[in-house]
Regions:
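Interfacial segments at transmembrane-helix termini and the short loops linking adjacent helices
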Residues: 131-145, 332-364, 410
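Hydrophobic alpha-helical transmembrane segments
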Residues: 143-146, 172-221, 391-395, 409-434
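Helix-loop junctions and terminal segments of transmembrane helices
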Residues: 52, 83-102, 275, 279-305, ...
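Signature of the first transmembrane helix
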Residues: 5, 14-21, 29-87, 240-267, ...
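Transmembrane helical elements of multi-pass membrane transporters/channels
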Residues: 36-53, 177-182, 200-219, 223, ...
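Interhelical loop/hinge segments that connect adjacent transmembrane helices in multipass membrane
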Residues: 18-30, 34, 169-174, 193-201, ...
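Interfacial transmembrane-helix starts/ends
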Residues: 34-35, 97, 101-118, 236, ...
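Membrane-interface junctions at transmembrane-helix termini in multi-pass inner-membrane proteins
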Residues: 151-173, 361-390
Length: 460
């Protein structure tokens, strides 16, 4: 019987009031803890975003459009490796090791971070093999990247590991260490006459290694690459699909980057990356908030499932509105003089400014898709999220190349925007189907308390 249905003279009324008060306190505590974790996530993303923006600005100032284009291709390749690493290692960690006992978390982190390092080693070897084919400026950028990819993957895995445990402050500190060592390293290289794309790319990865070592000390856990196969086998139901999903997302960017270079020239890649720099804080926030929202969604799904769809809608609303607001600020509130200063010269600003509109449309679409994608991952609906990713990726890649041929630099970004908006619609359709299935499964479980107890005992 609910507390509201008990009259004040009922003997059980005091007990009901106590239970109701405790429930309200529990809900308030849950909300407070969620906001605290989200706050650390926003702070961590701010550090990551500002570091990436500062690095991009410094590189374009120091190297010029052509070398910055080569650096951008290396960054796109890094994103490809990063999505592969996350899909195989930290995405399953976030789904299955959020809100678990510390001993279980340490066991999962030991294997997940080791897997991330192994993925970095494999992709690094492949990147170094590509150096002989590329040569020139692009080859120099890929050489610096290939030598440091294992360190970059390991550093990224610590961020996800800390957020899975609700330790956002540790992730914030780790990213701060990377930023605090990276920017001085770039300045030192320029002062000593080593301002070229190889040394800048190498310094970017080497300083990530410093943060990766700091992550080991923070967690008190040593990565175990030897357990990579064991981790992959145990989580292949999620890892395989997340790998394909992340690889597709990165492949679209690879196709866009290389296609733009072939069709429009290497400088055009630099202009596109410069526009990404302008919307950088929102782009990184939209794509990176999953390290906060995914474990948070997993916690809410376990503890307060009725609030789960609301949380996913709020994620999409917040990210899409933030992206729209930032785009408006760039279009209306940023004087051209500031744009020249940020990008280094009017020669870079002039072709970059028109790209802000399609970039904003792209970012808003990504924000709308984010909530549904988070929900699908938290529910373990990897098959449904993969289906949405495949359709969106095919549309984005084809439209991006067609747009580059027909409409130049703007067309390639509008093509990506079409793909991400179609993907957002499919994501929400799949989310609705997955949530209906989850509710039906939960209803069946509640009707069979014995089965539910056996399931819970098995999980423990």
């Amino acid at each position: 019987m609910a507390a509201a249905e008990l009259s004040s003279d009922t003997p059980l009324a005091p007990v009901a009031r106590v239970v109701s008060a405790r429930s309200q306190l529990a809900v308030q505590r849950l909300i407070t803890q969620s906001f605290r974790r989200l706050g650390w996530g926003v702070a961590d993303q701010a550090v990551s975003s500002l570091t990436n923006v500062a690095v991009s600005i410094y590189v374009v100032h120091s190297l010029g459009a052509a070398q910055f284009g080569a650096f951008s291709l290396a960054y796109v390749t890094y994103g490809f490796a990063l999505n592969a690493s996350r899909g195989l290692s930290t995405d399953p960690l976030m789904v299955r090791f959020s809100a678990v006992p510390v001993r279980a978390w340490r066991r999962g982190v030991r294997r997940a971070t080791g897997t991330a390092f192994t993925v970095g080693l494999a992709t690094g070897i492949a990147t170094l093999a590509a150096v002989t084919l590329l040569g020139g400026t692009a080859g120099a950028a890929f050489l610096g990247l290939g030598l440091t990819l294992p360190l970059l993957m390991l550093q990224d895995s610590w961020r996800f590991s800390f957020f899975a445990a609700g330790r956002g402050g540790h992730a914030f500190l780790n990213d701060s260490i990377w930023g605090a060592t990276l920017l001085p390293a770039l300045v030192l290289l320029r002062m000593t006459g080593h301002a070229n794309v190889f040394w800048f790319t190498f310094a970017w990865g080497a300083t990530a290694g410093i943060a990766a070592v700091a992550g080991i000390l923070q967690a008190g856990v040593l990565p175990r690459p030897a357990y990579t196969w064991d981790w992959l086998v145990k989580h292949r139901d999620l890892g395989t699909r997340y790998l394909l999903e992340g690889t597709l997302s990165s492949a679209v960017m690879q196709v866009r980057g290389y296609g733009t270079a072939l069709i429009l020239g290497l400088a055009a890649v630099g202009y596109v990356q410069a526009s990404v720099t302008l919307v950088g804080p929102m782009t990184i926030l939209s794509l990176g908030m999953g390290l906060v929202t995914l474990p948070e969604a997993a916690r809410i799904l376990r503890r307060s499932p009725r609030q789960f769809p609301v949380f996913c809608c709020l994620v999409s609303a917040g990210l899409s509105l933030a992206g729209l607001a930032w785009g408006i600020v760039l279009l209306v509130g940023v004087p051209r003089g500031i744009g020249h200063a940020v990008l280094g010269s009017a020669d870079v600003w002039r072709p970059t400014y028109p790209l802000v509109i399609p970039q904003t449309i792209y970012v808003v679409g990504g924000g709308i898709a984010a909530g549904a994608g988070t929900g699908l991952h938290a529910m373990g609906a990897a098959r449904r999220s993969l289906r949405a990713a495949i359709i969106g990726a095919l549309i984005a890649a084809s439209c991006s190349l067609v747009g580059a041929v027909v409409w130049g630099i703007e067309g390639t970004i509008y093509g990506l925007a079409v793909g991400v908006w179609v993907g957002a619609a499919i994501n929400w359709f799949e989310f609705r189907k997955a949530w209906q299935e989850a509710k039906r499964a939960r209803a069946v479980t509640h009707k069979q308390p014995g089965a539910a107890a056996d399931s819970a005992q098995g999980e423990r």
